Structures are given as structure tokens and as C-alpha cells.
Amino acid sequence: MLYLFRKLADIVIKRPIVVLVIILSISAILAGFATQSVSVQDVVTGDNELTQALEVIDDVFGEPTSVLQVVLESDKDIRSADALSALNSIEGAIHQSELSGTLVTDSQQPAIVSFLSGVEQAAQEAGIDPNYLDDDMVVALRQQSLEMLPPQFADLFESLLGSGSPPTTGLMLVFQNTTGLNSIQVTDQQRELADVISAVDITQDLTVTPFGFGLLLTANDPGPEIGRLFGIALVIILIILAVVYWFKPQAGQRRMIFRRTAADVVMTLAVIIMAVIWMQGIGVLLGPEYLNIIGHFSPQTQIVPILIVGLGVDFAIHLFSRYRFELGSSGDPEKALRISMTTTGLTLMLATGATAIGFLTNLFSPVSFLATLGVLAAVGITAAFLLTVTFLPAIRLILDRRAARKGGLPLKALASQTEGGLSRIVERTAWLAERVPVVTIVIALLLTVLGGYGFTQLDNEFNLTDFVPKNEPLLLTYDTIVEKFEGGFEERTQVLITGEAISPQIHNTLINQIAKVKEIPGVQSFGEFADANSIVSVLGQAFSTDLAFELASLGITADLRVSDDTDVEALYSLLIIKVPGADQVIARSDNDDLITRVDIRTSAGQDGAATLAANLNEIFAPLEETGMKVVATSRLIAQARQSEAIEDSQVLSLLIALAGAMSLLVIYFTINVRRPLIGILTVLPVGLVLALTFGTMAITGIPINPVTATLAALSIGIGVPFTIHFTSRFLEERVKENDCGSALRRTVSQTGSALTGSALTTAIGFGVLITSSLIVFQQLGYVIVYAITYSLMASILVLPSMLALWDSWDRRHHESPS
């Protein structure tokens, strides 16, 4: 490996222009592919029985209707004449618009209903002109109309009035025909209808907000938010880089130092930009349009450029820091570059490998976009490394050769750069390793145990609304629907039932279990029954038609059960042919297997989704005893399952990441210095980083979610490079120094100060995420700052103590420290 870096250094030294041309050509080619990237919303995906059931339901039954919930809010009782007038205006605008043709026309389902439906009819029956109603009359007539309805219908209309005394919110439901439309087209159709409703002139005393969950998730493109965060992070990091790269000039050299600092900052910026371009281009090549190895880019994977900014800048800092030190010592740019490439360059390769391993553990994540994110991050960090060891040294060498010919190299200033205040402050931490290494390690172990306990206390959450900006108005509307209307009318839970054949026993068991669904918490009722579409509702509709006699002849009784000799196959075929809507609950697969579903209106929400699924599966368990397969599923249930899967995969991801990084380092240090134990010691402090980060997350209330679930990868990606840099430099210094203390002090002074500068840069850069309007990115910002802080502490406080004890043991067992 050292031979390869020597050859690479030779190429850069002999042909820097050629290196630059090759790098810029590759960047131009990949930039062409980068422009082809497509961003696709991808959050709740995965390959499990829940998502597979949702796909079957979508393919076989589809969703023939969608409901747009229109929330009316007022500072006073919403049962008012103004609200009635507003509802009439909205309904009139809908019927007069081009979207009137999208309204459902089913006689069993009115296209538009509201909390004041029936008021005008009650007024007309009472001989009152609806145009002259006052608020009190509206309240009275509404109550009168409800009393005229069957109890189940009265309960339904009552649920359209928000809770509170007096109620200040009410709902209008607009049902649209969505046959043949996919989810994107359904949302687009709802958005057009929402625009029509929003354009209606309503009295200022009322607020009218059309709402659909699809509208909420697509209301804001996260792209501009990511772009803003990327831009801010870049600007802040560049400013800090200027401070980090600046060093005290000698007399008359201020302008020279300024130009050099500015050039280093610009070169680092170029590396970051090209690394992002390479990541985007290679991501397209690996994506569905070409190699189909990873998924599409998504709004969530667009956070990768910010990761590249934070982690990629670290490479430039370390390479420039070592190069400046060697240049100041030797005065020869070529010699300084060769030493830097074969020492720091090799260390950067190890850090890149460990970081890539950490991110690639996301391939084991049950959330598909995390797998894509992991691959993209690994590609981006690898690109940053390649550019750092080719583009940066090539252009720096060209500039320094030119400066050397003109006598413009600030050698004395470069030689004195490690004597700064930061180096002296950091050097003092070596006292712990020299005087109390055992105490330091014991304290670290205790903190690791405490952090591990914090890990057991972490919550797991997977809410799609976390991907919606906090200032999005529709998010407030969503909260209103959850609070005032028990989640509203969009939440549906499906029970998919499949099997090879249907028998009287299976049919009767299905009827029996459907009757019990109403007892489950979170299931909305319609009179005495659960508000659900199922074989029960289809049979009830059939009995109200002229099919009643034919059904009776087939063996259907009044309680919808069948006799033992009933031909249930023929019964279901008759229902599909003769009863409108029966094909929405009964179907046949391509293999002629039975597929039926129970489509239930629920209000369990995210928190109750898992419990609801468990209760439904328990209710329908007797069907499985008859040979049928039962799966209770919904978008919320799938999210809950994903949350559990993320938690379960955390330990596996951690073990894989740590084992991979440790194996890499053990192999390297075995080959390079014949000290495999060093590889293990270098990774061990990362365990402290993980434990403390998890513990701090528990203290600050940050849960495990699809974004913070990248913590294993991030901690490996941030922590291992820190410890690798320190260990590698220590091994160099212990060869030069006979005294372990001197080697530690020099390592802490030189590498420790670079690590501190790098940590400061990346922490502030990633800290920009804390300003995001997206909760998950805010949380990720905090988590990364935690990980960076603890990685720095572990590398300059804990690792030196471990190396001090190892050095003492190693010198007793080996004649040479090399």
C-alpha cells in the first residue's frame, strides 16, 4: 500500500498538469450524468409483508375514491349562518368548476357532505327561507335534521363537528373519483380541487383550509431547504477554513500568507464541489436508469452533500497541515509532498475505508432510502479522498514551485505554525496519558456503560410529518384534524385476506370476526357496526335490491351466514357481477386464489398503529386456522413496523460497522508495523463515542428515526478517522522518540491540534442542520455535533492513555518500536 502512494506521489510530482487535466475531465463527464438525477419521494418503503399487502391491495382493488377534508375554523361557534353560507359557496364553486366531473356519482355515496348538511332541507320543511337564517336557527335546525336521521347516519354527521364547547371547527368532505389514477395523480387532482376551494371568497370571520395527507407531504419541496443548508454550511466552513489555514506571518509576509490562505480555501472548495459532482454522477450511473444497484435520489438523500462538506473538508485540513509542516522543515515542495502523501495520504485512505464501511452498513437498513443514502455517502467520501490526494497536491505543487522560483515561500512562518496557542493548549491533555492512563480509561468505561444504558431508553419514531417543515400551514391543519376530529376521515386500515378457496366455514368465520371489529380501540363505528367496506357491507347492499330472493336460494340467511352446503364460490361470483362496488372487496388473483379485504375507517394515528394492527390480527386469527392468510396493514402500520425494524437493525449495523472497521485496521497494522493489537485499540474509543452519543440523545429527547438511524455510520465515519490520524502519527513519533511521553506530546501537539481544528470546522458546518425547518434534519444536526465532540474527546483524551499502556507493554515484549 505504501508503494502505491509512493507511485502516486511520483506521478503528481512529475506530471501535475496531466493529473489536473484527468481530474477535470472526469469531473466534466460525471457532471453530465449528474444533471440526469431524478428526485423521488421515498420514505415508507421496504420489502415486508405489510408493504407487499399494500401493493396487492393497490394492484387488485385500487382506491376508487379519495376524500378531501375541508376544515372550517372560527373564533366562535362554527354552527353559524356565515359557515352555512361559506359551505354553500364552496359547494357551488366546485360544481361550477372543471373538476365537477371528478366528483363521485355513486348513489350510495354523496359527493359532498358537511357538518351542516341537512340544515337547508330542515329549513325548507319548516317553511323558513334558508337565506334568512341566523346562528341560533342554524343550531336548532341542525339538531332537528340529526334527529330525523337513523342513528348511524346521525353519528356520522355529528363526527364532522369538531370537539369543544362550543365547537369552533367543522369539516366538509369532498369525494372524488380516482379510478385508474396513481397516488401522484390523486394528489394532483386534490391539489387542483383545493385551489378551487381556496379561491372562494369567504367572510373574514372564517378560515377555510382544504387538507389531504398527500397535499401535506408534497406541499414543500425539500430541495430548496437542502440547498439553503448546503450553502450556509459551505460559507461557514470556508470562513472557519480561512481561520484554520491562516498562520502567523513573518515581517512583510502578510500579503503572501493571505494569498496562500485564500488559495488553500479555494482549492478545498473546489474539492468539495467536485466531490459532490462525482457523487451525483456516479449515483445516477448506479441508479435505476443505468445499473439499478441503488434507488432514486430522494429529498432525504440530498443531505449527502452536507455530509461531504463536513467530512471531506477534514481530508484537506489534515493533508495541508502535514504538507505545511514538512515544507517548513525541509524547504523542498517535492519532498514535503512525498512525505505527506506517504504518511497522511495513507492515513486518509484508512479513514476513507472505515468511513465507507460505516455508511455501507445502511445497506442492511429496512428503509430503502437509507441504503441509497449509505451508498451515495460512501461514494462521495471516496471521491473526496481521491480528489484530496490528486487534485489538491497537484495544484499546490504547481503554485509552490512557482513561489520557490521567485523566493516567495514563507518557510519560517510555515515552520512555526505548530507553535500556536491551540497546539500548546491541546498538548497539555497529554498529561492524562502520562500520569493517570488507568484512571482515564476507567472513567471512559464508566461513561460507556452509562451511555449504553441511555441507548436502552431511546424512543423509536417514524412520522412522515417530521419531513414537513415546521412552518408549513397544512401541518397546523393536520394537528387540528387529529385533535378535533380523532384523525379525520383519511385514515383507513386494510385487512387483506387471501387463500386458495372459500368454503362455508371460512365465510361464516369471516362474518363472525368482522362483527367483532367494532370492539377494537381506534376503529370508527357506523351505528352498531364498524365503519368498514367488506363482504358484510356488500351483502347488506345486495339484500336491499332484487337479489334478495336469489341470495336466499343460494343459502344466505338473514344474519349473512351460509349453510354448510352453500356454494360460496358461486355466491361471491354473483356478488362481483351484480352488486356495484363488490369488486372493491372481493377479487380473484391470476392463480384464481380468493382475495378479499376489510377496509376500515380508523383513528389510531401513528402512536396506536402497531396496537391496532395487533388487535386486528388477533380478531381475524381464526381465519388463519382455516388456511387463509391475514395481514392487517396501512401506511401508518407500515411506518410503525419500519420503526421497529430500524431499532432491531441498529445493533446489527453497529456490530457490522465496528467489525468491518476493526478488521480493516487490524490487517493494515499487521502488514505495516506487525502490531495487530493497534488496530483494535484504534477502534475501541469509537465505542465510547457511540455510547455517549446515544446517551445524550436519550437525555435531549432525540429518538431513533430513519435519519438519526444513520448514527452508526456517522459515528464510525467521524470517530474512526480521528483515532486513525492520532494512532498513525503516534507510531511515527515513537520510532523517532525513545520516550513514550515525548511521542505522545508531539502527537497531541501536531495531530491533536489539526483534529481540533477539523472538529470545530465540521461541527459548525453540520451544526447548520440545527437551523433546518425539518425536524429530522434538526435532530441529525444535534446528533452529528454530539458525535464530533465525543470523537475529539476520545481521540485526544482516551486513546492516548490506551496507547501509553500499550507502548509500555509493547516495549517489554519487542526490541524495536517499529
Segments the model singles out, each with a brief description of its role:
Residues 1-262, 402-655, 808-818:
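Feature of extramembrane
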Residues 1-42, 178-460, 604, 614, ...:
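Membrane-embedded transmembrane helical bundles of large multi-pass transporters/channels
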